[in-house]
Amino acid sequence: MSKNIEHTMQFDLNKTKEALTKAILTEVYDSLQQKGYNPINQLVGYLISGDPTYITNYNGARALVRKLERDEILEEVIKSYLEIK
């Protein structure tokens, strides 16, 4: 944190949301892989259908992914794919 109190700090909610989405997807991906599933196929199934049973309960992955809205996940994935900030 800056010691200069003359300047106003800015909080970037978009970067926070992006970091949270990445952290959750990484954790879910790892959990799916550890259980022997194809993580990409399972995540695509979940994103298309909204059915959380595509995601394993292992390591709390299902509960984690449900903390995010599917449209927000897709938004972050597309921005990352197209390298749009």
Swiss-Prot record:
Residue ranges of the TM segments: none
Annotated InterPro entries: IreB (IPR009309)
NCBIfam families xref list: PRK05473.1
Family: Belongs to the UPF0297 family.
Protein name: UPF0297 protein CLL_A1175
Organism: Clostridium botulinum (strain Eklund 17B / Type B)
